[in-house]
Amino acid sequence: MTISSAHPETEPKWWKEATFYQIYPASFKDSNDDGWGDMKGIASKLEYIKELGADAIWISPFYDSPQDDMGYDIANYEKVWPTYGTNEDCFALIEKTHKLGMKFITDLVINHCSSEHEWFKESRSSKTNPKRDWFFWRPPKGYDAEGKPIPPNNWKSYFGGSAWTFDEKTQEFYLRLFCSTQPDLNWENEDCRKAIYESAVGYWLDHGVDGFRIDVGSLYSKVVGLPDAPVVDKNSTWQSSDPYTLNGPRIHEFHQEMNQFIRNRVKDGREIMTVGEMQHASDETKRLYTSASRHELSELFNFSHTDVGTSPLFRYNLVPFELKDWKIALAELFRYINGTDCWSTIYLENHDQPRSITRFGDDSPKNRVISGKLLSVLLSALTGTLYVYQGQELGQINFKNWPVEKYEDVEIRNNYNAIKEEHGENSEEMKKFLEAIALISRDHARTPMQWSREEPNAGFSGPSAKPWFYLNDSFREGINVEDEIKDPNSVLNFWKEALKFRKAHKDITVYGYDFEFIDLDNKKLFSFTKKYNNKTLFAALNFSSDATDFKIPNDDSSFKLEFGNYPKKEVDASSRTLKPWEGRIYISE
């Protein structure tokens, strides 16, 4: 590859070219039939991940935790949750990952910890404790007519209700933007930051991890004074804290400081990557986070494309959208890096998103496989670091018609209770909420991985075990590893081909630049071009169940059909009509 001086983003890095496979440890593979996935279960399936074509694994939190938010509430950063195994099991997993030629990335959850963490226990023990200022403690704003303390401001928790919890012992509130057992750490306190770096970052660097996925990495810097948020939702007492918590005044300073800690700590020459979950940010802010010269983050996750079709006021309020809206939002993931020294990611699924075929494809029995392959074609052709989530490679779909009682997610339960309290169980608000969770709940991604047709647990646990969460019935319909490996036309086997295609053409697939939409207003067709030196890639993707026409740019005869989701014998490369849910990639040199 020749690096273009006009495109410093094309400087090769292992973490730019790698395909990352995300593992949700509770739901991946149970090795001891206790109903929970574990470290040994992951280790037993590393060859499967390698054969898929992945180059790195990212494991969601496996640390000691009360599991109020599935491990994103950490009680000890230096200990594996015993249900998942021992620290030694984890070190062995890191070693095996490296022996197979893959990298190991772990989740870094340091905006908040668990209320069971020793730091918080000390902090809440008294107002004069040395760690009191490691968290945000504030007296009540006042008391209501019933004598109940009023929270210090009107900030809303991401999980519903107030972002403050009252502590009876010291008669003060503590801030927790998420769950009541996830107190926010005070990054303004230097001693607190040093302890975070040492315990959550340094310990795992010393044990060989290759990078960190940084949870809610845009929330560390809160505006001093924690003022009331502007009222944007007149139907709620509680308002989004984003103006005072998202991409705050010292956020870049904090990331530079942590990046410096990482570079100082690693002595063996390995290059550590960091990917920040940065929610929403302007292009300029994204460039500040990921510019190589600024030493903050390697790359980031943005939510623009996964939030399409949801209200900015409340995620669980669906709004209509068209393909054009999604195309524009998806391109926001990578267009800002063009001609810079920045980098980004591409993904459709993770532990916080539903299944992409249900959300953006067609999960009907007729079109599930072909639309799942279409999404794979799209992802394989986009610029940035590609992330694939467990089960995505199988063409997994959302579960169907579950009552709210079956949902496990604390975000669903807390919002359900908040809506019930504020609007009532039979309200229009509740009806909209239940409609939304059927489409976009995080729980759709969290059902146990489907390894086989074996009843009743699909090979995730032994037949006599009771998994921690219900299974998706789709394992009985062929959506499982064992069936798909045997089926040459399965989504799984297609993903293997897609990742081979991406690697074989990495100059233009991974590093391609100057992305341009073709026929942006088209409601069925997603088509674009991008370049790398003298090469041009042209993609034509039919996001509909109808045959759809397309045009090759400038009728250029040098474009050769390189990849698509229909069998080659069924495709006339000279045809300008796409079959339902057909995607094609052409390259000219």
UniProtKB/Swiss-Prot annotation:
InterPro entries: Glyco_hydro_13_cat_dom (IPR006047), Glyco_hydro_b (IPR013780), Glycoside_hydrolase_SF (IPR017853), O16G_dom_2 (IPR045857). GO terms for biological process: disaccharide catabolic process; maltose catabolic process; sucrose catabolic process. It comes from the Eukaryota. CDD domains: AmyAc_SI_OligoGlu_DGase (cd11333). Changing residue 218 to G: Does not alter substrate specificity. Induction: Expression is increased in response to the addition of maltose, isomaltose, and alpha-methylglucopyranoside. GO terms for molecular function: alpha-1,4-glucosidase activity; alpha-amylase activity; glucan 1,4-alpha-maltotriohydrolase activity; oligo-1,6-glucosidase activity; sucrose alpha-glucosidase activity. Coiled coil: none annotated. It catalyses: Hydrolysis of (1->6)-alpha-D-glucosidic linkages in some oligosaccharides produced from starch and glycogen by alpha-amylase, and in isomaltose. The record marks 352 as: Transition state stabilizer. Its EC number is 3.2.1.10. One of its GO terms (cellular component) is mitochondrion. The active site is at 215 (nucleophile), 277 (proton donor). Belongs to the glycosyl hydrolase 13 family. Major isomaltase (alpha-1,6-glucosidase) required for isomaltose utilization. Preferentially hydrolyzes isomaltose, palatinose, and methyl-alpha-glucoside, with little activity towards isomaltotriose or longer oligosaccharides. Does not hydrolyze maltose. PANTHER family: ALPHA-AMYLASE FAMILY MEMBER, NEUTRAL AND BASIC AMINO ACID TRANSPORT PROTEIN RBAT. This is Oligo-1,6-glucosidase IMA1. The lineage of its organism: Eukaryota, Fungi, Dikarya, Ascomycota, Saccharomycotina.
